[in-house]
Curated annotation (Swiss-Prot):
Coiled coil: none annotated. Occurs in many kinds of cells as a complex with monomeric actin in a 1:1 ratio. It comes from Olea europaea. It is found in: Cytoplasm, Cytoskeleton. This is Profilin-2. InterPro entries: PFN (IPR048278), PFN_euk (IPR005455), PFN_sf (IPR036140). Its main location: cytoplasm. The keyword Phosphoprotein applies. Binds to actin and affects the structure of the cytoskeleton. At high concentrations, profilin prevents the polymerization of actin, whereas it enhances it at low concentrations. It comes from the Eukaryota. GO terms for molecular function: actin monomer binding. Phosphorylated by MAP kinases. Disulfide bonds join 13-118.
Length: 134
């Protein structure tokens, strides 16, 4: 399966049981910051933003004082799973980033999608990729 199909079919799809509710943007990005696939709405990010995210996976808590920045948007870092998932909140929306062996699975949401729904969509694909050795 092509990487774009993972984004289109598994991240930007309707949320289970909530027809018409979906993430506002999603991407799969390599650990080096190269974009493997993304939705048309995924923000253009700076290399230093991706470096900060990768540092937080290696040194959990790194982003907590400054926030998570992606595409010029600042998210307040909320509970995650050290070395596995980073979650951020901004107003009525937020972001979930799941690290796999080779990539970051990113999902951005706004209401009516809930944080839990975004987590489920992003982490389910991330877990699948981990199971595949990716």
């Amino acid at each position: 399966m092509l990487w774009q199909a993972y984004v289109d079919d598994h991240l930007m799809c309707d949320i289970e049981g909530h027809e018409g509710h979906r993430l506002t943007a999603a991407a799969i990005v390599g650990h080096d910051g190269s974009v493997w696939a993304q939705s048309a709405t995924f923000p253009q990010f700076k290399p230093e933003e991706m470096n900060g995210i990768m540092t937080d996976f290696n040194e959990p808590g790194h982003l907590a004082p400054t926030g998570l920045h992606l595409g010029g948007t600042k998210y307040m870092v909320i509970q995650g799973e050290a070395g596995a998932v980073i979650r951020g909140k901004k107003g009525s929306g937020g972001i979930t980033i799941k690290e796999t062996g080779q990539a970051l699975v990113c999902g951005i949401y706004k209401e009516p999608v809930t944080p839990g729904q975004c987590n489920m969509v992003v982490e389910r694909l991330g877990d699948y990729l981990l199971e595949q050795g990716l």
